[in-house]
Amino acid sequence: MKRKIRIGIPRGLLYYRDYILWKTFFEGIGCTLILSPPTNKGIIDKGGNISIDESCLPAKIYLGHVKELSQKCDYILVPRICNYGKDNRVCMKFNGIYDVVNNLFEDKILNYDIDYIKGKFELFGFIKMGIKFNKNIFKVLFYYIMGKIKNRKYYLSLVNKQDKILRSNKMKILIVAHPYVVYDEYLCGNIIRYFKDEDIDILYSDRVNRKIAISYAEDFSNTLYFLYSKENIGSSFYYKDCVDGIVFLSSFPCASDSLVNELAIRKLKDVPVINIIIDDSTATSGLMTRLESFVDIIKARRDNG
């Protein structure tokens, strides 16, 4: 029996947005996926050792996950995302990470490009990848479409679940952060656990209808450059009257977040806001003290009506 092609999936960046698409597609065309383990200090150290000092923490973590997969699979999936149109760019790390990985590692790299300006669409990239492993183009197309449907269905289920949370009378906090930051247990697990231990409902900025979030972001500013920043910031204005507080979580040294979050914080009125920047040496004790003070302020506001 022919051995299945093993595709390595680094547990970082777009993993938190597109994993269901990747899983459905590659397993459907006869491949098997190998996930890197959850982020830990060893992975961060491995990524940091092969990164330039100016790299942001998520990029270092991503390289650490690639290092963890190196020599353990036939291909490593590293998408290259440039833009979703002239007014919807993405951070340069999504554009450059493929070239960085390709230069640092000897493994075979599998990728698809998204660059709407140059006519490079996701569909074409998946077809190109798929026929490498399965010559039946109809099967390749079928599992790409199935992957998109399942990925969107899962995303909409999260949006609907979050909408139901809004109906509760419990204290609610919105966390504004990129998925690869807030859902990384090693980076933000202690923050999430703290709010849950305090019996606070948590809402997430990526679990909002993206079109609605973008429309709110464009009302805030028509010059926002990055698509993912639009989605984050738009959600903060969409939810500002529905939550008791907003937590901005970003990683060091993210240039886009440092600018956009600061602009949003200045515009958000009548709601407590805290801005937290995480790096690989963030002290838990100091962070918890800040969160405790933030929650105390929110509770005092609720008690005073």
Model-assigned labels for residue ranges:
Residues 1-305:
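An N-terminal assembly and electron-transfer interface module characteristic of large anaerobic redox
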